[in-house]
């Protein structure tokens, strides 16, 4: 049974990876002849009356759900780019030596029968 499951996973996983990669290319196509492997009609479902300013500044990831949720998480979604690009520099120079270092060799046992 384990062999059957392993063979099944080894056959399905590459197909799923290629399907998810192809899904990124077919999103939001406007052409009339857009049928190919993995293509589906994309419908935005949002409430009426929202302006462009009220829309979320995220990548549309609901297509990835249709394609087994593989690739949309590769594209990191951040709301504020300035916060995401902030890098804190730390001082890598140590000003003091480590005080816990004991450079001596370990002592030999003082008992005759354990030596």
From Swiss-Prot:
Q: What does this protein do?
A: Component of the czc cation-efflux system that confers resistance to cobalt, zinc and cadmium. May have a regulatory function.
Could you tell me where the Polar residues compositional bias lies? 93-102
Q: What induces it?
A: By zinc, cobalt and cadmium (zinc being the best and cadmium being the worst inducer).
What's one GO-annotated cellular component? periplasmic space
* Alphabetized UniProt keyword annotations: Cadmium resistance, Cobalt, Periplasm, Plasmid, Signal, Zinc
Question: What is this protein identified as?
Answer: Cobalt-zinc-cadmium resistance protein CzcI
What subcellular compartments does it reside in? Periplasm
